[in-house]
UniProtKB/Swiss-Prot annotation:
This is Putative transposase for insertion sequence element IS4SA. The keyword DNA-binding applies. GO terms for biological process: DNA transposition. PANTHER family: TRANSPOSASE INSL FOR INSERTION SEQUENCE ELEMENT IS186A-RELATED. One of its GO terms (molecular function) is transposase activity. Gene3D superfamilies: Transposase Inhibitor Protein From Tn5, Chain A, domain 1. It comes from Synechocystis sp. (strain ATCC 27184 / PCC 6803 / Kazusa). It comes from the Bacteria. Belongs to the transposase 11 family. Keywords: DNA recombination, DNA-binding, Transposable element, Transposition.
């Protein structure tokens, strides 16, 4: 195998304790979750544990489920933080360069009847993705239902300095726009709803909305596929801090919002975020964070050019070699002990 996967495992996983619990230590616990997400040959937790038990791993699914209910999700957040820190080193951002940060939420179905009985049938996950670095950020898990205009503030706050938060109509709220206008060195491009009143002013800005919440803002209007797009933004036409941004450029920035949808698509199609098999809130958080960890590992992974260059190529490359090692649990232990 020609890749840096072994280095990634030793750097970010091998330091976790291998003897802090008698049956299911932290290293094995994290390895099982990663195996569940990364192993394309496994379709359920039960089938994964069947393979593990047949090949010498004594931990059972009941012990794993209990651990998933009680173990600290901070371990998984710590891995995410370390991987993101390493990824950020790989891309040098030029001074004055705008970092585009499209963000959105996605709905993930819960399969556990125990959670259904508690009134939870789905989870809404918020995230953005920095297109300069490829790093997801501002990951927030919200149980239950609710419109994006009521939530998502934590994700928006993760917009990097000199970054542009790109949002769809679901995030449209006049009070939110007021807050965003006050941000220093952070910008936004937000599509507003078609029923919001616009009044053009003498300075070419618009008065957005009516009543006490109305606000003056730059608005860019364009049409695409017979649909009108009205974008509120605080990006300047002229500025000393950054290069001026034309209306056409703002329209192009908004079209990059689709990149966050591609993130959700990859996580759901290939890293098993399409349905949550965990049976409690803590375990659901762990499953979601594990999907993000797997995504970041793939971002860091380097494989031979002839094997491909896409994230899916990398996942398939790992799968081809994992098949020689019984499971990811066996393979990660072998790599960590080298």
């Amino acid at each position: 195998m020609i890749s840096n996967f072994g280095h990634i495992v030793k750097t970010y996983l091998s330091n976790f304790p291998k003897d802090d619990y008698p049956v299911l230590d932290t290293f094995k616990f994290v390895s099982i979750w990663l195996g569940l997400v990364l192993d394309q040959s496994q379709t359920s937790m039960r089938s994964m544990f069947k393979r593990l038990n047949l090949r010498g791993e004594t931990v059972d699914i009941s012990t794993f489920s209990k651990a998933s209910k009680k173990r600290d999700v901070g371990v998984f957040r710590e891995i995410i933080f370390s991987l993101k820190k390493e990824l950020s080193k790989r891309k040098e951002i030029k001074q004055g360069e705008l970092e585009i940060f499209p963000l959105d939420s996605t709905i993930v179905s819960i399969t556990s009847k125990l959670m259904w009985n508690l009134g939870f049938h789905q989870v809404k996950v918020f995230s953005g993705i920095n297109l300069s670095t490829g790093i997801p950020g501002g990951i927030v898990i919200h149980f239950g239902q609710g419109h994006d205009n009521k939530y998502g503030n934590e994700t928006i706050e993760e917009t990097p300095e000199n970054g542009v938060a790109v949002m769809d109509r679901g995030f449209c709220d006049l009070q939110r726009i007021k807050r965003l206008q006050k941000e220093n060195n952070k910008y936004h491009v937000l599509r507003i709803k078609n029923n919001i009143k616009l009044e053009k002013l003498a300075n070419d800005n618009y008065m957005v909305g009516t009543g006490k919440n109305k606000i003056e803002s730059r608005v860019v209007i364009f049409t695409h596929d017979n649909s009108e797009f009205r974008l509120v933004t605080n990006l300047p036409i002229e500025s000393k801090e950054i290069e001026g941004v034309s209306d056409e450029k703002i329209a192009e920035i908004y079209k990059k919002r689709w990149q966050i949808e591609l993130l959700w698509k990859f996580l759901k199609m290939h890293l098993k975020l399409n349905r949550l098999i965990a049976k409690n809130e803590n375990a659901i958080g762990i499953q979601i964070y594990t999907c993000i960890i797997a995504y970041l590992i793939l971002k860091l992974l380097v494989i031979p050019k002839e094997a491909g260059t896409t994230m899916l190529d990398k996942l398939r490359y790992l799968q081809a070699f994992m098949c020689e090692k019984i499971s990811y649990v066996h393979w990660l232990r072998e790599l960590a002990l080298r």
